[in-house]
């Protein structure tokens, strides 16, 4: 991986909707977070360790996700490494990062933003669940893996194979098992984003919160093979999947990737699984 990328953590992402305010208020209620209007018609949902930008656009779209670097020196060194490789650098689309942030486009056209927060991340709120990873589905999974691993410098943690063909790839930008992953699918689209809680008891408490809001669990509870984390998922009003996770595996930077078979047990050691392809 590039020397300058490690560590980087998911700071925020943008979720688009034809009804941006309605979706922002759903997430505010879901997470118990404050909701505020931003310039340009965007909305901010901010809480303890998590920030979400909601904008007007196509249903379920995630036009970018944003990784926070350690400091300005790391950000500058990383940009220089990318430029030396001939990577096209674009202006940052994020209203939450300070000047100096920049973006690159992945093979599916989604922007990955790198930068530093313009202000402190949310610290208010009683509910514990920090924004931790984003996952997409893609029709060109091999190209996506090559881009994120070889061009951007994320470290491959696990891959899933079906008859020798790549079915999923999990990559990390810090010791947590994955900050980004991609699945092979018939169409390229967002898959889910995930909030990491502290323990199994937190998963229970978030499940109880879903019950109080009359939001049914869509998948889980269960335990993933890659990452070994406890989880459940719900759907937001547009069908985008939202995961609550605990005990995600920590993987040293130098650890080589593992290979898993494409089967239900890989995605859920406890039972049935959501098979993307």
Regions found by a protein language model. Give the residues of each.
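Vicinal oxygen chelate
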Residues: 1-3, 9-18, 57-81, 83-130, 135, 169-171, ...
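N-terminal beta-strand motif that seeds the catalytic metal site of vicinal oxygen chelate
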Residues: 1-21, 62-67, 118-142, 155-158, ...
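Core segments of cupin and vicinal oxygen chelate
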Residues: 2-50, 96, 100, 136-178
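Conserved short beta-strand elements that form part of the metal-binding/catalytic scaffold
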Residues: 31-64, 68-69, 110-118, 159-191, ...
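Short hydrophobic alpha-helical module
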Residues: 151-154, 173-177, 196, 203-216
């Amino acid at each position: 991986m590039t020397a300058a990328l490690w560590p980087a953590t998911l700071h925020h992402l943008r979720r688009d909707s034809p009804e941006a305010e309605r979706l922002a208020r759903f997430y505010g209620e879901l997470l118990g977070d404050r909701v505020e209007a931003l310039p340009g018609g965007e909305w901010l949902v901010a809480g303890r360790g998590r920030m979400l930008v909601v904008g007007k656009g196509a249903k379920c779209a995630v036009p970018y996700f944003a990784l926070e670097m350690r400091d300005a020196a790391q950000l500058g060194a990383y940009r220089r490494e990318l430029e030396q490789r001939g990577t096209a650098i674009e202006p940052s689309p994020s209203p939450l990062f300070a000047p100096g942030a920049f973006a690159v486009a992945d093979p599916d056209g989604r922007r990955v933003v790198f930068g530093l927060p313009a202000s402190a991340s949310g610290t208010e709120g009683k509910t514990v669940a920090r924004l931790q990873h984003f996952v997409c589905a893609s029709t060109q999974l091999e190209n996506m893996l090559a881009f994120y691993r070889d061009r951007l410098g994320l470290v491959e943690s696990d891959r899933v194979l079906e008859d020798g063909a790549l079915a999923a790839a999990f990559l990390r930008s810090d010791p947590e098992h994955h900050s980004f992953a991609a699945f092979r699918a018939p169409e390229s689209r967002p898959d889910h984003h995930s909030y990491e809680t502290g323990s199994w008891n937190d998963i229970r408490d978030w499940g109880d919160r879903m019950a109080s809001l009359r939001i049914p669990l869509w998948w889980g509870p269960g335990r993933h093979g890659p990452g070994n984390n406890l989880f459940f998922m719900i759907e937001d009003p547009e069908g985008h999947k939202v995961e609550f996770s605990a005990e995600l595996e920590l993987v040293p930077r130098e650890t080589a990737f593992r290979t898993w078979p494409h089967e239900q047990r890989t995605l859920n050691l406890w039972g049935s699984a959501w098979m993307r392809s």
